[in-house]
Amino acid sequence: KMNYQANSSKAEEFIHHEEILDTLEYAQNNKDNRALIEQLIEKAALCRGLTHREAAVLLECDQPDLIERIFHLAKEIKQKFYGNRIVMFAPLYLSNYCVNGCIYCPYHAKNKTIARKKLTQEEIRREVIALQDMGHKRLALEAGEHPSLNPIEYILESIRTIYSIKHKNGAIRRVNVNIAATTIENYRRLKEAGSGTYILFQETYHKENYETLHPTGPKSNYAYHTEAMDRAMEGGIDDVGIGVLFGLNTYRYDFTGLLMHAEHLEARFGVGPHTISVPRICSADDIDAGDFPNAISDEIFSKIVAVIRIAVPYTGMIISTRESQESREKVLELGISQISGGSRTSVGGYAEKELPDNNSAQFDVSDTRTLDEVVNWLLELGYIPSFCTACYREGRTGDRFMALVKSGQIANCCAPNALMTLKEYLEDYASEDTRQKGVRLILNETERIPNPKIREIAIRNLKAIAEGKRDFRF
């Protein structure tokens, strides 16, 4: 019988079913154990994280005053490591041809009602120009799995195309990649093409449930999918992004699996996930969220975000436009550090608006605001919308990035970088109202940069940006 082993290379040993069940039972038995919960909150306050078992107890806790303390700590930890910066990105769908049979995704091979589309390099060019004209600097590439139509060569060529496009003052400076599990060799090629974070959602960590949800196609292989991040790391990609699709399975099980996956990467490679995404199942063409009885409430969603934030303090946390404005507002302060804005979830949706009957979207967007409206809203809430990609371009990835975050030194890098990239956005793309709000925020925030030397350089650079210069970074 297999034992639980965090640093094993085998999926069923590092995501160990019995260990998860034991964890959930332990959490259930201790959900009213105030002394233990208070002790865990104190441990979490040291900002060194919690184990999956400890985090599971906090997630089960249902005493209002303790939940309040957990939320309060999540906000403090977020403030300490990420300040009030929110990184902006947009998804770019390259192709929705797919050979898999995932029953919760409208791209599944049997769906005959969806419009299938694959962008040519020229169409990618048009999409990227549209994205640059909105002000985006960071993209997440999305593509269905199709060995002949979306081979790795197509993805690599697309990455090169995206980086090559310089339109007016626009530039895409980091391309993160969300494609199906692949080989060590292909991960190496992605790295060489300049890809940023490699993102792959587990969907669910429950093997049996996973196999039911993925009946056909290469993705039906649980171990191959679950061990993808190990292969990515072995292929030299040191920033990886994990996530589950909450609502496919019971949230407690997947929450525990997610943290075990993070512990596994830390144990085996010395560096945990760069990001964790927390999407929730939602309706789309041929998919009705109501068919999934495990869908979670906003209240539980907030709790999940808060506990992940204190359990893995060094990991960025991402939400998409599946979440409504109200839902996003709540979780931003509890731990989210990266959001998408102005997203189109259809293939080719940026260059031209999709016709209603030409449905190629992966899911229905709840937050339909433009990027400028999202930036304006963030400024209104006191956040710094950041278009920064400096760490990736300075080679501060993997353990170098983590060391910087852990030392708390990131404030002297990130704050000025965020302000300078926001300034670029205000100069080149913002509406007048957004520009005025942004200028005020930049004035206030520049004063808060701890290191006087860096503050002085930042002020000088901000002035240069106003005069038309671009692309400064610490």
Where are each of the predicted segments found?
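Short glycine-enriched, charge-decorated loop/helix-capping segments at active-site entrances
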Residues: 213-219, 290-294, 360
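Conserved C-terminal portion of the radical SAM core fold
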Residues: 143, 197, 223-287, 297-326, ...
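Generic structural signal for well-ordered alpha-helices
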Residues: 90, 128, 156-163, 187, ...
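Core AdoMet radical
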Residues: 109-126, 130-233, 238-248, 270-277, ...
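Canonical Radical SAM [4Fe-4S] cluster-binding loop centered on the CxxxCxxC motif
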Residues: 82-123
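An N-cap/entry alpha-helix motif that binds or orients negatively charged groups
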Residues: 38, 42, 46-86
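Radical SAM enzyme core and accessory elements
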Residues: 1-39, 43, 326-334, 343-474
